[in-house]
Amino acid sequence: MPFAQPPDYSKSVFPIAVGIAVAVVLFTLTRSTLPQVGDNIHNLPHGGNYQDGTKRISYCGPRDSFPSSSLISSGTPMIIGIIIFLIFAIYVSEKWSRSGSRRCSCCVPGAPACTATVHE
């Protein structure tokens, strides 16, 4: 009775994991961290004026130094630098940890590219 390999789910799980990771990163970068200004009906997060009867709201908006909800802000060069540094660090660690030779994790003994030994 020949043994069958277990199904390889990595090809279907990997795109799902990447999609979830991208969604979490975009949600984190685009969520609003601005203070809530106004009441339950009138919201002025970016500044403005509103007058209704006896109610008057005048808000000048957040300062440039306040962390905003925009995806591209003044801290973007630092974020890009951190990403490039992490990519470089992963590349260097992969080069040094493998000591130059790569072997396949699963190979058939006797195949031309296989370095495994035959055990009987």
Curated annotation (Swiss-Prot):
Localisation per UniProt entry: Host endoplasmic reticulum membrane
Pfam family, one: Plant_vir_prot
Any single biological process term in GO: transport of virus in host, cell to cell
Cytoplasmic side: 1-8, 93-120
InterPro entries linked to this entry: Plant_vir_prot (IPR001896)
UniProt keyword list: Host endoplasmic reticulum, Host membrane, Membrane, Transmembrane, Transmembrane helix, Transport, Viral movement protein
Chain ranges passing through the membrane: 9-29, 72-92
GO cellular component: host cell endoplasmic reticulum membrane; membrane
Domain of life: Viruses
Transmembrane helix keyword on record: yes
Record bears the keyword Ribosomal protein: no
Family according to the record: Belongs to the Tymovirales TGBp2 protein family.
Note: TGBp1, TGBp2 and TGBp3 seem to act together for cell-to-cell propagation. TGBp1 is the main movement protein that physically cross the plasmodesma with the viral genome. TGBp2 and TGBp3 would facilitate TGBp1 function.
Listed name of the protein: Movement protein TGB2
Biological source species: Apple stem pitting virus (isolate PA66)
